Structure formats: structure tokens, C-alpha cells
Design a protein with these regions (language model features):
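Beta-lactam-recognizing serine transpeptidase/beta-lactamase-like catalytic domain environment
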Residues: 1-33, 38-265, 277, 281, ...
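Active-site loop architecture of trypsin-fold serine endopeptidases
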Residues: 268
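Short, gly/Ser/Thr-rich active-site loops of penicillin-recognizing serine hydrolases
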Residues: 178-186, 276-337
């Protein structure tokens, strides 16, 4: 866990307040499309959505004075894996509404995303959640706007998505530490089958989607980009971004989750002026994994191993393969009015 800029712990009084601020557990941020991991898992685990289902993303969704649109519009029906791979806000919002507001609240509560974490750090912050959770809140929260959490909230929740479906309260104490005397909360949040599907989706983003720059040769990285405009003086500022990439590896049997979040990054010549998660945060994750995996003694994984491919390839039960048949329209009619 790191928060930059940092300071000399032997001389804290000399450090500016900004340097003493622990962004990993004290800062709360709208973490954008990283939340699509939770929405996809929630929809799949509910039984109301399958990997084969499709959603109409042809037009933006208008709710009152709000318009939900896509950064890279495909303007067609998308399957669930395509919604995730193309990071469609429209498709994700419709998946959330298929489950409903009450279902979303319960799901995020179970992941610890709506309350302060019990981690052993006194500065750990409370998330910011809507006072009134309306349908428009359900839709925007589905893609990580309208809710602000700490980076530790996000990493602990993503761990549950990829580890087989069990949420474990985060701790900074080693399991065998004499100081670790209390039993940490732990409970199942999704099925093992849904967790396996989430691993497929996250690997898909790195292989074919917006997260290609996060890959690290031999370590089967999977993940999700997240780019959110910051709220400044009560309005979202288009040029002030929180850019993130959250990853797990190796995706055939995840051992670690890594999150990199940059506060107001600037585009460069190398990023063609872009400052989004896929351009600025994903390469950080790639470098961290490439350097830490050998230190941790993790063996490299052969991505072409048939067993690995069977675990991570998306077929029909899931799409995104060229020349496959069109996805089945999402069951139910409630979404048509949004």
C-alpha cells in the first residue's frame, strides 16, 4: 500500500498536510468504470442476466435532466462481455436496472462499499453514498459515479469478485501475527460460477479491450479501467480526472489484486494527450506486477495451455467472438422506459 507524495515518518511535523494524507484509506473517490466489475457480477449472479444476453446501446439513456452516454459508442446491441469490454455506460446502467435499486444496495452493502472498513488504521474514511437512492442513482453508480469510496474499499471488493466469491474484511496484519487476535468478517457474496465469469471478463479487457497496457508477460493479468471526472464546486470538471486501473493476477488462479489510481493526471506525447485509466494507470499496474511477481516467487503461466484457455476463454454462453450469432435481448421490458 502506497500513497504519494509521502513523507519521512521520522519527521512528520515537517511534512505538508497533503503529504501526510493517506490516499489509500483516507481519500474517497468516484472510481468510475471499475464499478462495472460489481454491476456485471451482480447482474450475472442474480440469475436475471446471462453472458449470452444482449442490451440495446444504440441511443443514450435520458432520465430527467441527466443523459447517460458512452465514451466509445458502439450504437448497437451488445452482449454482456461486449458491454464490459467496450466499457459501455449505457449497457451497464441497463444491467443495473435489470436487478433494481434494492438489489444493488444490498449487493454493494455485502461488499463493504457503503460503510467504513474495519481495517486497523484510524484514518480510514467513510464512503459517500446517496442520501436518496433513486433509479438515476442506481444507473450512475453502476459505472462508478454518484458513490465515492477509498482505494482499499475497491481492492477488497474486487478480491471477492475473483477469489471464488468470498468477501474478506481487509487487514494490514499478517495472518500469523501475534497482534492478529480477532476473527475478521468473511462471507460469500457471489457464486463460484459467477466469480469464474468475472475472471473471464477481466481478462477479456486486457486481451481485447481498454486494458491492454496493463498486461505483464507470463502473469495473465485481468482488470478494468476507470476514468471519472472530479466534482469541483458542485460540478463535474471535464479536464480534472481520477484515472484508475484495478487488476488481478494470474487470472486462471488469482493471488493478488493491484490498484493504481492517479489524481488529475496529465496526458503526454506518449499517451497522445489522453489521461484516462487505460493510458496512464494501466501501465503502472503492468510495471508493478512485472517487478513484484518474481519477488513473490510466482511462476509464469503459459497462456496457451489448454487448461488455462478453457478457464478464461469466453464462448457462447459468452460472446465477443467474431461471426457468432446475435445476442439474445435481455429478458423483461422495464428497461424500455429509460
Amino acid at each position: 500500500m502506497a500513497s504519494l507524495p509521502d513523507y519521512d515518518p521520522m519527521r512528520p511535523a515537517e511534512a505538508p498536510a497533503d503529504h501526510r494524507f493517506n490516499r489509500a484509506v483516507q481519500g474517497v473517490y468516484e472510481l468510475g468504470s471499475t464499478f462495472k466489475i460489481f454491476t456485471s457480477a451482480m447482474a450475472l449472479d442474480s440469475g436475471r442476466v446471462t453472458m449470452r444476453d444482449g442490451v440495446d446501446t444504440t441511443d443514450p439513456i435520458r432520465v430527467g435532466r441527466f443523459t447517460i452516454s458512452d465514451f466509445h459508442p458502439q450504437s448497437r446491441w451488445l452482449s454482456v462481455p461486449e458491454i464490459f469490454m467496450y466499457s459501455s455506460n449505457i449497457g451497464t446502467a441497463r444491467l443495473a436496472m435489470a436487478v433494481g435499486t434494492e438489489g444493488q444496495q444490498k449487493f454493494l452493502n455485502n461488499l463493504g462499499l457503503t460503510q467504513r472498513l474495519s481495517v486497523e488504521l484510524p484514518e480510514a474514511a467513510n464512503p459517500i453514498v446517496p442520501k436518496t437512492w433513486r433509479d438515476v442513482s442506481t444507473m450512475t453508480i453502476s459505472y462508478g459515479h454518484g458513490i465515492a469510496v477509498t482505494p482499499m474499499h475497491l481492492t477488497s471488493a474486487v478480491s471477492a469478485m475473483v477469489n471464488g466469491g468470498v468477501w474478506n474484511a481487509p487487514t494490514i496484519l499478517a495472518a500469523n501475527s501475534p497482534d492478529n487476535t480477532h476473527k475478521l468478517p468473511s462471507h460469500r457474496v457471489i457464486s463460484e460460477q459467477t466469480s469464474a465469469q468475472v475472471r473471464q471478463l477481466m481478462r477479456l479487457v486486457v486481451e481485447h479491450g481498454t486494458g491492454g497496457r496493463a498486461d505483464a508477460d507470463g502473469y495473465l493479468v485481468g482488470g478494468k479501467t476507470g476514468t471519472a471526472e472530479k466534482a469541483v464546486n458542485g460540478r463535474y470538471a471535464e479536464r480534472s480526472l481520477i484515472s484508475s486501473f484495478v487488476a488481478a493476477f494470474p487470472m486462471n488462479d488469482p493471488k493478488y489484486v493491484v490498484l493504481a489510481t492517479l489524481d488529475e493526471p496529465k496526458g503526454t506525447k506518449d499517451t497522445y494527450g489522453y489521461a484516462t485509466g487505460g493510458w496512464v494507470a494501466a501501465p503502472v499496474v503492468s510495471q508493478v506486477i512485472a517487478e513484484m511477481a518474481p519477488i513473490l516467487g510466482l511462476p509464469r503461466v503459459n497462456a496457451d495451455d489448454p487448461k488455462v484457455r478453457r478457464a478464461l476463454d469466453i464462448r457462447f454462453d459468452g460472446p465477443v467472438i467474431e461471426n457468432e450469432p446475435e445476442p439474445t435481448p435481455l429478458r423483461g421490458t422495464r428497461l424500455a422506459s429509460y
